[in-house]
Each structure stands twice: as structure tokens, then as C-alpha cells.
């Protein structure tokens, strides 16, 4: 699909890059010539990911801590600047909102919103000071603009990231720093998937409500991320690209649900009644 050197020698930091979509993106970046740098909170997970990647620079970092983020970026910059940042680290769970404690809210906002801001602003300051061309890609969700029940802290955080992306795209675009976002639909990952889809019948429901009838494959998102991190997307700035098989569009249409409820007999009855 892409030339083998699409991301040649680009140094790209992927937060939460030890598992899930973060790892899948880091792996694809490396296949396309990039030098991936991954960070996370668990040394053993990072070591295993680096081994699977055939070698990668790793940093143990709790991105909720601005001092830790700054120290990590200082360490990374000792061997040269980054060329890109992928804000992927996240935390989420389903809950009735009235049961959420302040600690539960802060747990999500700290990782998703604050951590993303700390990493983006920290990289941005260094790039702008040096006049270094760079790209930021943030992983959001389709409910960043629609909202969603039962994941309110996540919806708040992702909406904030999208606002940051669009704002800084304007502020920094003229200084060679682009910012974009990807809004994924369902992409199963171990751990996170079980927390968000706790009942087997919910998996079937998710697949049925998707126009393509399936969840996304990690390589599909990783390929999109690779394009947005590459120089081929140099004129794409301040955008959010949805990759969900049309799921949110189906949910938004007033009568989209009808196709799942009507039988052939129902349609025949409508035609016989004069509907066109």
C-alpha cells in the first residue's frame, strides 16, 4: 500500500505504545522506516513491546505527571528531536455517571486530557524553539462531538483533545507543526475491550449496528495513522478523520434503524399501500 520508506528516519513518540492500538501503530511506523519511541507506565510491558518490535526506545512515564513528561522529553531530546507525536494513551470504563467519584473522573481526565496536553505542549515548545518541522496525531472518538452516555469523563476528555487539535493547528501551522486527529470506531483490544464491552451479546450488537458488519482491524487504523504522520499529508491540518465503518453516521440518521427491523413482508405491505 505504501512505499517502504514512507516514514524513513522519522522519530515518532507513541504514548501508551506498549499495547493495543498504540503498539500496532508503532509496529507499522517501524515497518515503514520510522524510529518508534514508546512510553507507558509498566516497564515489563514496554520491554516486551520493544522485543516484539525488534528494538525500540522505551521510556517509563506516567503522563498524568507534567514533571515526568518534561523529564521524558528531555531524555528523548538528548539524542535528537522527535519528528512526530502520537497521543494514544487512554483510560476508559463504563459507569452510570451519578456513581462516579471525583477520583474516577480524574483518573480518565488525567490520562486522556491532561496527559495529551502535557505531551503536546512539551513537544511543541521544543519544536517551535528549534524551528523543527513536526506532526502531532491524537486518537479521539466519534463521541468527541456527539457526547455519549456512560463514558462521560472520556467524552469530556476526547472533546477537549479535539478542541486542542483544531486550535493548535491554526496557532502552530504556520510554524511547520501540523496537528490532526483520528476518531476510531470499535477496534477490539485486550483489556480495554472487556472493560467497555463486558457482555458477549454486546459484541454481537456492536457488529450488527455497523454498516460493514464488523469491528475494525488494527492494521486499518495503523495505515491511516501512517499516512497522517507522513509528508504525503502535508496539507492536512486541523482535521479529524473518522474510521468506524460508518457506525456513527448510522446512529445519527433519524430512520437508519428501520433497516434492522423491517421484514420483506413489511416492505411489501408498504409498497402495496402506495409507498414509493
PLM region spans:
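A glycine/serine/threonine-rich, flexible loop-to-helix segment
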Residues: 174, 184-209, 250-276
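Active-site helix of classical SDR
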Residues: 120, 157, 165
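Short, small/polar-rich loop/turn modules that mediate ligand/substrate recognition or access, typified
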Residues: 86, 173, 178, 236-238
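Substrate-binding pocket helix/loop in short-chain dehydrogenase/reductase
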Residues: 96-109, 206
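C-terminal substrate-recognition "lid" of short-chain dehydrogenase/reductases
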Residues: 214-243, 248
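Conserved glycine-rich cofactor-binding loop
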Residues: 16-20
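Alpha-helical segment proximal to the catalytic Tyr-Lys
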Residues: 125, 170-174, 234
Amino acid at each position: 500500500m505504501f512505499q517502504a520508506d514512507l516514514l524513513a528516519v522519522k522519530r515518532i513518540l507513541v504514548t501508551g505504545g506498549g499495547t493495543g492500538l498504540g503498539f500496532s501503530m508503532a509496529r507499522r511506523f517501524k515497518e515503514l522506516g520510522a524510529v518508534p519511541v514508546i512510553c507507558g507506565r509498566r516497564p515489563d510491558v514496554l520491554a516486551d513491546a520493544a522485543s516484539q518490535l525488534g528494538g525500540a526506545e522505551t521510556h517509563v512515564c506516567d503522563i498524568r505527571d507534567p514533571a515526568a513528561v518534561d523529564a521524558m522529553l528531555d531524555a528523548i531530546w538528548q539524542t535528537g528531536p522527535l519528528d512526530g507525536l502520537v497521543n494514544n494513551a487512554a483510560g476508559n470504563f463504563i459507569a452510570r455517571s451519578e456513581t462516579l467519584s471525583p477520583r474516577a473522573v480524574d483518573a480518565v481526565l488525567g490520562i486522556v486530557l491532561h496527559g495529551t496536553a502535557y505531551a503536546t505542549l512539551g513537544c511543541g515548545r521544543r519544536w517551535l524553539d528549534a524551528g523543527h518541522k513536526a506532526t502531532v496525531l491524537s486518537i479521539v472518538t466519534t463521541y468527541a462531538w456527539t457526547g455519549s452516555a456512560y463514558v462521560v469523563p472520556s467524552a469530556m476528555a476526547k472533546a477537549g483533545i479535539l478542541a486542542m487539535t483544531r486550535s493548535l493547528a491554526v496557532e502552530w501551522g504556520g510554524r511547520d507543526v501540523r496537528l490532526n486527529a483520528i476518531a476510531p470506531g470499535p477496534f477490539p483490544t485486550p483489556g480495554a475491550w472487556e472493560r467497555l464491552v463486558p457482555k458477549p451479546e454486546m459484541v454481537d450488537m456492536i457488529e450488527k449496528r455497523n454498516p460493514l458488519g464488523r469491528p475494525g482491524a488494527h492494521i486499518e487504523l495503523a495505515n491511516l495513522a501512517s499516512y497522517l504522520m507522513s509528508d504525503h499529508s502535508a496539507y492536512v491540518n486541523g482535521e479529524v478523520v473518522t474510521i468506524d465503518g460508518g457506525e456513527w453516521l448510522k446512529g445519527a440518521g433519524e430512520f437508519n434503524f428501520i433497516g434492522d427491523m423491517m421484514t420483506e413482508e413489511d416492505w411489501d405491505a408498504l409498497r402495496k399501500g402506495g409507498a414509493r
